[in-house]
Each structure stands twice: as structure tokens, then as C-alpha cells.
């Protein structure tokens, strides 16, 4: 929504790690060295858009397959692999160099773009994020319970914040925004207000 309102492209970096995880699971890979080698050999193309983005791997749009519970259960492990992060960050920076883009991810302000014009650390409680995810998934995955998703969200938070490379943390110059009580539209409005405060008139 934010990118669309600003007329910017949108890049969900988490989708890139999910795509790598999907490919690793499809190939039955577990060893970090093998996953790194696979990642380096992938022909990955990201197509940012104003409302959504697509991840193309070896000519196939894998976007519809990367939000499954199986991928969610392994993405933190795969994204913690140094070689995988190095490859993905390089792609993300190339996209950012084009300008006019909103990057969404857990290490953007600290690792990918430490000199970004505006940094917002978006957060909400584990329960709130799990409930949102549950509502997204319940139609396609009725076997999942809210408790399962909440446990998975908490596990991912722990793993991402304790990994050695690019851990999840708020950049010192990032603005903290808790959107636990905000709608999607309200969150976008709050982020635009933050941007306007730093660069008056930029969104007009």
C-alpha cells in the first residue's frame, strides 16, 4: 500500500528467501554448503511492483508456492546461511540502486541499505502477527491452528534475532512503529507521516 501510494516499486525481500527455501525443499537439500551452491546457480529474477512482486526462478514464477506452512517452517534456517544472504543482498542492492522503491525485510536498515533515506522498524505482538497470518491462511490451510502459527512466528523471531549474520534488530536511526492497533491503510498513513516529517512535501 505504501509503495502504491507513493508511486514506488515494492520489494519484499522475505519472498526471495522463501523462494530459495522452496527450491531447497523441492530438491531435498539440507546441507548449508549445498544450499549455498544451489542459490548461486539459481537464475533468480525479482519483479517489483506497486502492490505486489513476483519471484522468477529458472524461468518459473514461484510466487504462488512460497507462502506454504512447509516453507514458513524452514525459511529462517535457510535465510541464516551466510552464502544465501550474500547472494540475496546483492540482488536487493541492485534493485535499490534504481531508486523509487520500498524494501520490506528484516535486515534492510542494518545490512542491506544502512544509508536508506527513511528507515521504519515495523512491529506488533507475536499474537497479533500470528492472528493476521492465520486469517490469510485459514481458507487454504484449514488444518492449521492459531496456536501453531503463533508458535511458528515466535520461533522465527527468535531464530532471526539470534542468527550470526544480519540478525533481526532495529537500526539505531530507524523509527519504531507498532501497528498492532492499526489497519493496513492506517499503517500506510502512519508511515507516510513519518516520511513527510523527514522530507516535507515528498509524497505530493
Regions found by a protein language model. Give the residues of each.
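Small-molecule kinase domains that catalyze NTP-dependent phosphoryl transfer to phosphate-bearing small molecules
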Residues: 47-49, 85, 92-98, 110-111, ...
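ATP-dependent NMP and nucleoside kinases share a basic, alpha-helical "lid"
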Residues: 63-140
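N-terminal phosphate/diphosphate-binding loop that engages ATP/GTP or pyrophosphate donors
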Residues: 4-69
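Hydrophobic "anchor" residues on beta-strands that sit immediately upstream
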Residues: 8, 54, 100, 174-175
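Generic C-terminal helix-cap and adjacent flexible tail
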Residues: 193-204
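Hydrophobic/aromatic beta-strand patches that form the interior of the parallel beta-sheet core
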Residues: 11, 118-120, 175-177
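Active-site signature of alpha/beta-hydrolase-fold catalytic machinery across serine-
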Residues: 1
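Residue-level signal for inorganic ion chemistry
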Residues: 14, 59, 88, 102, ...
Amino acid at each position: 500500500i505504501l509503495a502504491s501510494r507513493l508511486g514506488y516499486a515494492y520489494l519484499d525481500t522475505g519472498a526471495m528467501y522463501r523462494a530459495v527455501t522452496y527450491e531447497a525443499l523441492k530438491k531435498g537439500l539440507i546441507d548449508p554448503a549445498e544450499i549455498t551452491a544451489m542459490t548461486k546457480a539459481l537464475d533468480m529474477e525479482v519483479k517489483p511492483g506497486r502492490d505486489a512482486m513476483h519471484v522468477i526462478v529458472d524461468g518459473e514464477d514461484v510466487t504462488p508456492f512460497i507462502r506454504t506452512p512447509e516453507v514458513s517452517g524452514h525459511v529462517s534456517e535457510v535465510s541464516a546461511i551466510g552464502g544465501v544472504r550474500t547472494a540475496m543482498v546483492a540482488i536487493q542492492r541492485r534493485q535499490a540502486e534504481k531508486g523509487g522503491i520500498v524494501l520490506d525485510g528484516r535486515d534492510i536498515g542494518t545490512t542491506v541499505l544502512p544509508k536508506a533515506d527513511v528507515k521504519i522498524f515495523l512491529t506488533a505482538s507475536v499474537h497479533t502477527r500470528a492472528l493476521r497470518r492465520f486469517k490469510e491462511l485459514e481458507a487454504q490451510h484449514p488444518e492449521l491452528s492459531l496456536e501453531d502459527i503463533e508458535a511458528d512466528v515466535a520461533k522465527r523471531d527468535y531464530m532471526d534475532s539470534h542468527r550470526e549474520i544480519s540478525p533481526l534488530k532495529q537500526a539505531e536511526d530507524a523509527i519504531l512503529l507498532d501497528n498492532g492497533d492499526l489497519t493496513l491503510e492506517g499503517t500506510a498513513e502512519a508511515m507516510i507521516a513519518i516520511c513527510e516529517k523527514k522530507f516535507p512535501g515528498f509524497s505530493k
